[in-house]
Amino acid sequence: AWAVGIGNTHLAQMKQGWLESPILYMALIGRPGANKSHPLSFAMKPFLDYDYEQNKLFEEQYSKFEEKMCMSRKERIENGEDGFPQEPVRKRFLVSDVTPEGLSYIHAQNKRGLCLWTDELSAWFKNFNRYNNGSEEQFWLSIFSAKTTISDRRSSKSSIFIKRPYISVIGTIQKKILSELAKGERSSNGFIDRILFVMPNLQQKARWSDRELPDNIERDWQAIIQHLIDMECQINEQQEIEPHVLSFTEEAKARLYEWQHHFSEQCDNETNDTIVSIYCKLEIYIIRFCLIIQLARWTCGECDKEAIDLLSVERAIRLTEYFKNSAISVQNILNENMLTAQQQAIVNHLPATFTTAQAHDVAKENDMKSRTLERFLNDNIGVLFRKEKHGEYSKINS
């Protein structure tokens, strides 16, 4: 919600020419009945309320526009109206089921930015090939990096040109559908690595409770997000948003560089290319987190927004570590879904930490040959298992 409120109004500058938008692709994971949708609806309600009011205003304006268009130009001028009335624009933050072409059209009218909000995220990626094979997926890969998009509409001779797009994505997904997300090229072209997964440890079905949120919680949240919504945007001569660019303080940048160097060492020691790819995307996300956290603190009156400070970086590091662990958990779920019954039985029977000898004993009990076991262990280092030292392993998802 913070990121959507910021949109294209602010950017983080890591180095000269390296700017990051607060674009997030996020999935809330849980079993059916795990209460995934309600917290998301609560967080996005201020935008939903804004869009509702703007839609009512648009309908009123469009009705008047149609009345004017039914007049002749002479009649419009005689009535004190503009000879060529401008068609009204519907202001909004949220979109749902929409094609890239339709999304580009809406974005051109709402240059501050949009959020694709879908209750079931599976509907988003299952539609990627419904029109042009693979083109929608490429569209979202480009949007993630805020690359200029050009949409040539079939019904118009003109093109929609969006210099710096901002579209975040958020929705819920069930654990059993995660494997659908990794189908096709999405696991190899880095698409799935761009998604931030929120997966609570507690996956039980929510129990009904008489407890109510304090009255001030919703009111305060509405006021906080409304502060972002009401934030003035600077518009340049080309009618494009001129974002406020935040650089880092010297101590904040030094801490971020220190973290990145340590993170790079983890990548160097990681044998699984999929995990390395996830780590690389998190290096982009941490800069975006820094921007979002700084603006969140500014909105609440805790700091200024002249530059991103050390406290925002420290909090962004903690947030990145959370998403790193969540991504690894998701990869483990995906890998377990692809295991044979024999392989799954071996994983289930292995203790949290084990030796090669123990693994051979478990393999023997499940009719797996020694050479097959060794290949299974080696192929899944960094995926299912971690090699602690020679002859000793641990299970990653334990």
Regions found by a protein language model. Name each.
Residues 1-398:
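Phosphate-handling catalytic cores of nucleic-acid transaction enzymes
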